[in-house]
């Protein structure tokens, strides 16, 4: 990193700035890089067919020998989902809490990377030392156990990364360690990187304990079957649902691979506790009274292939909605998922279920702190410089305002873009330069093989349709021997558009005869002539621009 001086610490992100997801941050001092998280981002609607988005790891691959380790703040997908794709390109040790490592272990096994990866479980009191830098941890509260903030000690000063956090004073699990945070602040912090997700919420975030009370209220009041959907990674929420089921004499059936895996890991690590006979097999749910059954499932985000979506649209093999069923959405829609969640809720209502959802029911709370919690973090850590992370630009902007309210000068606050490098030393900080960054699209097993041109083609196909032009040409005599024939898919209904098709065929035929008179032998030129002739004609007649695919056969 030539633009950073030898006595400066560099801080940068490959993902997570100006967006929700693909959180990947790094602290570099000279030849030592400490990597923090490697997450995925869920695609927005215009990314047709894309499964996930990860950062461009080019800089990390080129500097693999400098990476001392990857440190995980917690086990959510937007923080660990990219790790298998990163580890295909670099061989580095991974450090994290026992739950995060447990979730990651399953993920690496699926990708065939478990044997080659060195996994290290850390606790709050551990310190990982390298030649020039060291990494320590402090316990935070989030919507998943084993969440940590990270302190990277470098010669110019300490860099603190909060991870995702809230201050819950009646938590289900262990409370955040405010004492240690205050000690870190007292020792001195050069720069704070802090979670900006809920910076537009002026209040404290509701306690997870209050959600638990609402869950118990639902279980006491509902007589029929309860179908409960939430994030599989929200272990505390799963424990509270299971407790409510047990206390009300219900058995629990689990649907969804990620949910089954999370419960298995939670039980193994002691985060989920229940009597041995609590869980039942899938084939038992229809043999038991409705008021004795709870179904715990995935699909709270309206994912098309998740259990709840298939229940809602009637395609699930083992569960169909019965009169008296109550479906609980214990989540809020991730940006981009609002339409699919609404669709699922409507389908459930149409099928005859009662649906409990939304903020009025206190059945979900965020794992991210609001403004008062963000200000508390700022006052505990007391950084010299501040860099808001993990949020869209407006969230980062609001977080800077909170920082200035807490006494940090505005010129000491930096709203960064992915790839920009913040160079820090003593009383000085500046954006020193930029490294390669961007997005890599994952589609099935393909990684990075989907570019903007492919996405553009998918958009055209989805919105405008496809017209295939098939023509046979005798290249000896330069004459059309058959065709042109037109095939439409998603553009017009052929039987009802005979005049349009006939006119288009005649247009292409007349133009190709002129092309043949020039004795053209280049396939690409002939195809371009067909496209350039047909496209304006179709737009004039239909005001649509379908994708045109010429197929030329030589006779």
Curated annotation (Swiss-Prot):
Summary of the knockout phenotype: Essential. In depletion experiments there is decreased 5'-exonuclease processing of 16S rRNA, decreased accumulation of correctly-sized scRNA, decreased decay of trp mRNA leader, while correct processing of the 5' end of 23S rRNA no longer occurs in the absence of mrnC. While depletion/deletion of RNase J1 or J2 has no large impact on global gene expression, a double mutant alters the expression of hundreds of genes. In a more severe depletion experiment alteration of about 30% of transcripts was seen. Later shown not to be essential in 4 strains, with a tripled doubling time.
Segments for region (Required for endo- and 5'-exonuclease activity and dimerization): 450-555
Keyword Ribosomal protein: no
Top-level lineage group: Bacteria
Note: Present in about 2500 monomers per cell in mid-log phase.
Record flagged with keyword rRNA processing: yes
Organism: Bacillus subtilis (strain 168)
Name the UniProt record assigns to this protein: Ribonuclease J1
Pfam families per UniProt: Lactamase_B, RMMBL, RNase_J_b_CASP, RNase_J_C
Cofactor: Ca(2+); Zn(2+)
Subunit annotation: Unclear whether it forms homodimers or belongs to a larger complex. According to probably does not form homodimers, while shows homodimer formation. Both reports show RNase J1 and J2 interaction, probably as a heterotetramer shows it is a component of a possible RNA degradosome complex composed of rny, rnjA, rnjB, pnp, pfkA and eno, while finds no evidence of an RNA degradosome complex.
Record-linked HAMAP family: RNase_J_bact
CDD domains found in the cross-reference section: RNaseJ_MBL-fold
Group of enzyme by EC: hydrolase
Chain residues that bind Ca(2+): 49, 51, 443
UniProtKB keywords: Calcium, Cytoplasm, Endonuclease, Exonuclease, Hydrolase, Metal-binding, mRNA processing, Nuclease, RNA-binding, rRNA processing, Zinc
Function: An RNase that has endonuclease and 5'-3' exonuclease activity, playing a role in both rRNA and mRNA stability and degradation. Endonuclease activity can cleave within 4 nucleotides of the 5'-end of a triphosphorylated RNA. Endonuclease digestion by the RNase J1/J2 complex occurs at a different site and in some cases more efficiently than J1 or J2 alone. The exonuclease activity of the J1/J2 complex is highly processive on substrates longer than 5 nucleotides, on shorter substrates is distributive. Preferentially cleaves ssRNA, possibly in AU-rich regions.
Molecular function GO terms recorded: 5'-3' RNA exonuclease activity; identical protein binding; RNA binding; RNA endonuclease activity; zinc ion binding
Any GO CC annotation of this UniProt entry: cytoplasm
Activity regulation as described: 30S ribosomal subunit binding to Shine-Dalgarno sequences blocks exonuclease activity.
InterPro entries associated with the record: Metallo-B-lactamas, RibonucZ/Hydroxyglut_hydro, RMMBL, RNase_J, RNase_J_2, RNase_J_b_CASP, RNase_J_bac, RNase_J_C
Family the entry assigns: Belongs to the metallo-beta-lactamase superfamily. RNA-metabolizing metallo-beta-lactamase-like family. Bacterial RNase J subfamily.
